[in-house]
């Protein structure tokens, strides 16, 4: 395991496919990928599970293995370290290139550890990505052992980031169990995602305009929450905005509860089945938020 991690070489190979036909794979060695997992895991554990970040930064929602769209986001927002980034999870599954996607993100995490941040999504969990594509991609292109190494890394990802004490960011949403930020800080890592409770909800819950208070979630996991839950949470914790991902939205971003919550989704033409745009939210020094949109590519006539 004495392989020295040549980050520069790894990043340059991952970026070499810019402008190539979308879908061209980058085949790193298994040792290099294992090295990315181990080194990033070390950094993730050295940083808190609840990140306290400063603006300016750019926030991105689900990527789901759409590697060429991730590259488009960086073309648009600036490649690190030109801008600071926070990603809200769901890097793997469903898309064709989960490996390239997660490898580039982990490489940037290692190289720019204080300016580049990755939260955990519900797909950064073995029981989910075992089913929705990542396991199969690891097995086909490398080994099951490598998939297990990724699991060990994902189990150490942080779950919440608060930007300038005002913007609460997580993958899914709020939890009926969440009364103090200290509860989040007390979650010990490494950890799997449980079937219920605080950590589960932060990664799985959804806002819902028809819910008053807390409701059942059609996903069969966690809850839905209404606008009033958002308002009370923000007031109680002196926050301005909840920023989350986890749901496809047509324009790439969508507000809820009178603009007190925003959903971001950064994978345009999701799975090739939707005509949605992807969006990235830029937060400036004054905490003004603006959106950069990746338009969906016109569907080619078959």
Swiss-Prot record:
PROSITE patterns documented for this protein: SER_THR_PHOSPHATASE
Cofactor: Mn(2+)
EC number of this enzyme: 3.1.3.16
UniProt binding sites for Mn(2+) 1: 62, 64, 90
One Pfam family recorded for the sequence: STPPase_N
Record's cofactor remark: Binds 2 manganese ions per subunit.
Recorded family membership: Belongs to the PPP phosphatase family. PP-1 subfamily.
PANTHER family recorded: SERINE/THREONINE PROTEIN PHOSPHATASE, SERINE_THREONINE-PROTEIN PHOSPHATASE
Protein name, UniProt field: Serine/threonine-protein phosphatase alpha-3 isoform
Species in which this protein is naturally found: Drosophila melanogaster
Name of the gene encoding the protein in the UniProt record: Pp1-13C
């Amino acid at each position: 395991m004495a392989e020295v991690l040549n980050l520069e070489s790894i990043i340059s190979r991952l970026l070499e496919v810019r402008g190539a036909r979308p879908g061209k794979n980058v085949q790193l060695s298994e040792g290099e990928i294992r090295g990315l997992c181990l080194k990033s895991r070390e950094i993730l554990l050295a940083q808190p599970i609840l990140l306290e970040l400063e603006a300016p930064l750019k926030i991105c929602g689900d990527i789901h293995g759409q590697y060429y769209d991730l590259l488009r986001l960086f073309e648009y927002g600036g490649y690190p370290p030109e801008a600071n980034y926070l990603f809200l999870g769901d890097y793997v599954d469903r898309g064709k290139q989960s490996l390239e996607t997660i490898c580039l993100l982990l490489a940037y995490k290692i190289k720019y550890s204080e300016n580049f941040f990755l939260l955990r999504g519900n797909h950064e969990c073995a029981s989910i990505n075992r089913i929705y594509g990542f396991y199969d991609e690891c097995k086909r292109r490398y080994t099951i052992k490598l998939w297990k190494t990724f699991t060990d890394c994902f189990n150490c990802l942080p779950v919440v980031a608060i930007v300038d004490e005002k913007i609460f960011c997580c993958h899914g949403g709020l939890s009926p169990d969440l009364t103090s930020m200290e509860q989040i800080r007390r979650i010990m890592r490494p950890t799997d995602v449980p079937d219920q409770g605080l950590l589960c909800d932060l990664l799985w819950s959804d806002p819902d305009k028809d819910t008053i208070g807390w409701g059942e979630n059609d996903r069969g996991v966690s809850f839905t929450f209404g606008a009033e839950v958002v308002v009370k949470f923000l007031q109680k914790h002196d926050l301005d905005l909840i920023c989350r991902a986890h749901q496809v939205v047509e324009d790439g971003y969508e507000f809820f509860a009178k603009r007190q919550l925003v959903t971001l989704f950064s994978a345009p033409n999701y799975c090739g089945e939707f005509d949605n745009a992807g969006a990235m939210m830029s937060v400036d020094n004054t905490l003004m938020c603006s959106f950069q949109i990746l338009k969906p590519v016109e569907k080619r006539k078959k």
